[in-house]
Regions:
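N-terminal single-pass transmembrane signal-anchor helix
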Residues: 1-27
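Long, compositionally biased, intrinsically disordered regions
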Residues: 27-186
Length: 186
C-alpha cells in the first residue's frame, strides 16, 4: 500500500483553500445587492435636491429660483391639496415624485431666515407660507396656522432619531428671499 505523499497533501490543501475562498467570495457577492450603501444615498439625495431646485419647483431656464406658486402647491398637495397643471410634477407620493424607491425614506424641507438680512450667527428655521399675507414666515411663528390655508414647507417622515441620514442642501430663492432646500435620505 502506498502512503500519502507530500505532493498529494499539498494538492489537497490547495483545492480545499480554493473552494473555501470561492464560497466566501460567492456568498459575499450574492448578498451585496441586499445591503445598504451610503454612497447610493448620497447620490440619491443630491439627485433629488438638484431635480427639485432646478426643475420641479422652478424652471430649468432659471434654476435655484423657486416658483412660489408651485413650491407652495408641492408641499400642500402632499398633505392633501391638489396639484396645479402648470407645475412640473403629478399628484403622487413624495417618493414617486422624486424618483426614490419606497424602501428609502425622504424628507424635503425649506429653511431660511425670515427676520432680516442673514448674519453669520443666524440659524435657519423651517419655513411656512402664510397664505393670507402671501409671505414666508417661520413655521414656529404664530402667523403660521396650517389649519387655515398656510402651508408648512416640509414633507416626509421626520428623520430625528435615525442613526444615519444623508443630507443635500441647495441655496435657493423663494418669494424674493434666500432659503435653503434640504433633502434628507435614509
Amino acid at each position: 500500500m502506498r502512503g500519502q505523499t507530500t505532493l498529494d497533501f499539498a494538492v489537497g490543501a490547495v483545492i480545499f483553500v480554493g473552494v473555501v475562498a470561492f464560497v466566501f467570495l460567492f456568498v459575499a457577492s450574492a448578498v451585496s445587492p441586499f445591503t445598504g450603501n451610503p454612497q447610493d444615498d448620497t447620490v440619491t439625495a443630491n439627485r433629488v435636491a438638484d431635480e427639485l431646485a432646478g426643475d420641479q419647483l422652478g424652471s430649468p431656464a432659471d434654476p435655484y429660483v423657486l416658483d412660489t406658486f408651485c413650491t407652495r402647491a408641492f408641499f400642500d398637495s402632499l398633505n392633501g391639496g391638489s396639484v396645479p397643471e402648470r407645475c412640473a410634477y403629478e399628484n403622487e407620493s413624495l417618493n414617486d415624485r422624486v424618483g426614490v424607491s419606497d424602501r428609502q425614506d425622504v424628507n424635503v424641507t425649506i429653511v431660511g431666515n425670515v427676520t432680516g438680512p442673514p448674519t453669520d450667527t443666524d440659524t435657519p428655521v423651517q419655513l411656512c407660507w402664510n397664505e393670507s399675507d402671501r409671505r414666508l414666515v417661520a413655521l414656529s411663528d404664530s402667523n403660521c396656522d396650517t389649519g387655515t390655508g398656510d402651508v408648512a414647507l416640509t414633507v416626509g417622515p421626520n428623520p430625528a432619531g435615525e442613526d444615519s441620514t444623508i443630507t443635500a442642501r441647495r441655496a435657493v430663492s423663494l418669494a424674493g428671499r434666500d432659503a435653503i432646500l434640504v433633502v434628507e435620505v435614509w
